[in-house]
UniProtKB/Swiss-Prot annotation:
GO terms for cellular component: plasma membrane. The chain crosses the membrane at residues 10-30, 339-359, 370-390, 393-413, 441-461, 472-492, 535-555, 871-891, 893-913, 928-948, 973-993, 1007-1027. The lineage of its organism: Bacteria, Pseudomonadati, Pseudomonadota, Gammaproteobacteria, Enterobacterales. Keywords: Antibiotic resistance, Cell inner membrane, Cell membrane, Membrane, Transmembrane, Transmembrane helix, Transport. The gene is mdtF. Residues 31-338, 391-392, 462-471, 556-870, 914-927, 994-1006 are periplasmic. It comes from Escherichia coli O6:H1 (strain CFT073 / ATCC 700928 / UPEC). This is Multidrug resistance protein MdtF. The keyword Transmembrane applies. PANTHER family: MULTIDRUG EFFLUX PUMP SUBUNIT ACRB-RELATED, PTHR32063.
Amino acid sequence: MANYFIDRPVFAWVLAIIMMLAGGLAIMNLPVAQYPQIAPPTITVSATYPGADAQTVEDSVTQVIEQNMNGLDGLMYMSSTSDAAGNASITLTFETGTSPDIAQVQVQNKLQLAMPSLPEAVQQQGISVDKSSSNILMVAAFISDNGSLNQYDIADYVASNIKDPLSRTAGVGSVQLFGSEYAMRIWLDPQKLNKYNLVPSDVISQIKVQNNQISGGQLGGMPQAADQQLNASIIVQTRLQTPEEFGKILLKVQQDGSQVLLRDVARVELGAEDYSTVARYNGKPAAGIAIKLATGANALDTSRAVKEELNRLSAYFPASLKTVYPYDTTPFIKISIQEVFKTLVEAIILVFLVMYLFLQNFRATIIPTIAVPVVILGTFAILSAVGFTINTLTMFGMVLAIGLLVDDAIVVVENVERVIAEDKLPPKEATHKSMGQIQRALVGIAVVLSAVFMPMAFMSGATGEIYRQFSITLISSMLLSVFVAMSLTPALCATILKAAPEGGHKPNALFARFNTLFEKSTQHYTDSTRSLLRCTGRYMVVYLLICAGMAVLFLRTPTSFLPEEDQGVFMTTAQLPSGATMVNTTKVLQQVTDYYLTKEKNNVQSVFTVGGFGFSGQGQNNGLAFISLKPWSERVGEENSVTAIIQRAMIALSSINKAVVFPFNLPAVAELGTASGFDMELLDNGNLGHEKLTQARNELLSLAAQSPNQVIGVRPNGLEDTPMFKVNVNAAKAEAMGVALSDINQTISTAFGSSYVNDFLNQGRVKKVYVQAGTPFRMLPDNINQWYVRNASGTMAPLSAYSSTEWTYGSPRLERYNGIPSMEILGEAAAGKSTGDAMKFMADLVAKLPAGVGYSWTGLSYQEALSSNQAPALYAISLVVVFLALAALYESWSIPFSVMLVVPLGVVGALLATDLRGLSNDVYFQVGLLTTIGLSAKNAILIVEFAVEMMQKEGKTPVEAIIEAARMRLRPILMTSLAFILGVLPLVISHGAGSGAQNAVGTGVMGGMFAATVLAIYFVPVFFVVVEHLFARFKKA
């Protein structure tokens, strides 16, 4: 093939230009993302049982739905929560690659089977089945510049005018409002109700009657008289609109003819529909909307669309209303991709300089440089064809590919230059001869490297998706690189290179010194190799010791899934003791805000807090803060990284009394959890009951707290059992007094909860009407005695006459995992430990708990456990495939052994570099390790290929052949290896956005390549001679 293109250079150029055009078009159309669709798709089923406590919801709703979710294709695990507000949520997580649409349809079909078994009140409320991500993409906050709008004004405007348009924006899965729109609030006074012989149900029924939209029909409607001349709509009654109009609702007419109006027994006002959350931006009243990404949607596109929509809507905002973004994960995605692009350019420049240093000929150097954009753009075209995106993983693959793809072109150019110099041939003839010598080696390198990366494409789960991105990117670039090295590169060599002048090229002073030094080094290397081959047994023992060291390093290197990143944002949770009020929670959140805005003012840009909300559940004792940091360019230095900021905050905020305040970083993959660290589900496998499971959980937390050198921040991601005020109704006594149980329940529910009645019109929008006891009449236990129920004879009877009260404890939020009662435990690895170490430590602690208590990993930890199980198989398959590929290529069993023995030399370098830098054995390291395996084998192939050829064609002995081959190939091996090492150097020294991933990939590969080069050039000749002798003996035997 090479000879064909040497004679047709224009054709070679045409193919290269077509590849570049295709790649250019692909780049313009490829979507950009931080990661591909790594996270498995999730489907969430949400239901509401009004008035039910957590246990009732779990027994009558959650379990009924769970028990019908069997036989779903690709279901990995299922988690659920039931809370005291009557809410049930079941989240089903499916295998990566499962179609979210099909999963949603299957879940809906299974839900239909459960519907007849659910309470009627649940069915009336409706059950939703959503496919949005559980994680927050961004938060838009709304504030009043001059303070003219209070938090309820802001929240009402946002709920009425902004929430719905945003929820319809492309890519948005769901939105969550931090605040509430207005509602008509009817605050009842029990003493006045009793005075007029009224109960809450009377008020509700009259509101329903008098605040109603009636369809009055028409005058002159069809069918009509033949001479009918009039047609008009009849308006009978419309909905009320103001508190004054509601206050005039007639409740009853007394015997003396006087009227009792709603305002006589209640205070009527325009208030919030929901008072459960309080939002603040930098301590000022605010409202917010959390945007959650639709499953499979692109984060950057969605964020852009949301901001464009808000910008459009801002033209209609009240004068003082302003939008800010206190939490946005997309700037990190943009900047991290830009950083990798920058790394790509830096790698190309460094590779060019290395090639120029060794080739010392601009014409020769420009040829491999031309191959770089051709192959890279061609790879983008392939990525587009297979449906990939421009993301961190594919860009890392490109950076690694630069060192690989110039290798082929360097090998071609270097050998052509050698043939021109040694054989005094013109460039075209020299290129023909050179390609005959190295064509098989190029194919061998391509086969080996493709064989290394191919098994990665068949791994499963989120880890498999990461491997697949690297695999397809690297294999595509490698195959294109070999094609270019056998088409465009020889054509360029034949046309661009010049014949060697008499006496050879005259290098400048710098190159002359380099050449002199290199020639001396080459001679020293040749002499050293000859010495090594006289005592191969000794050096095989050294090799075995290196292998033993590799095994020790493997066991010593901590494991994790993905490295943590400084994403420019993080969160802080605050949890107060059970029963704490919103007033206390708001004060704690203000302390958190003050700390970040004063002690960390050089790093923190804004703080947005939400009282009453947390990932562990909703409640007055819960709070969450979204902290946005200043740009990375303004936070230079390790002390200003998110990790350092969190560590300082953890110490400072631990001093806040009567609250557990915990700052935490975001997970590497947003859709796989809400926090970094580990995520464990403690399971009640033995059906021990809620109390025993709580005791086991507390024991686990106590054991974990005793080992701060292993794990830190171990905490339950749930709500503690809270005091509950139980009203025991004596049904027999109530019946004897003529009081209906339904009336008792209605009175208690309305007074101490609230009752939704119907709707009213406010500023052209339909809003809700609620009836509830006034604040003074539902604050204390004694308030229960202020409420009366009318009996069958019309007499008012106090609740205390037929009921008793007592204090008890109960859970406001119950959890289940795969249909088993559970409690979620979150935590972080201690300094110097990886999440893999922390997970193993926690698993050992669970083994000390009472029988019947088990555990399971979920979220990011589930994927980490899965990846650690797959890694050994991946390494083994890759090595076997490489061995078989070499055996098939060389029609020999001995040559593959000579090549494969070099692999541990690269691996020990990768492990040593990773260990010295304090990094862990994560997915990026594993990809780097496979790259190291391929590159180690490549260097060995370059030497062994020439040795075999000399043995076959010139009849040399194995020792003579391998010494000469090693001498001849030393220069291209060092050149390609140094080019690759410097190509990944920008990854190793990267800092700022995305540096965690860049360091993880670059460090292992650089260390592995350095060791593989320095050690392999000495050990490959030893391996070759030892293997040839062993196989020769075997054949004789």
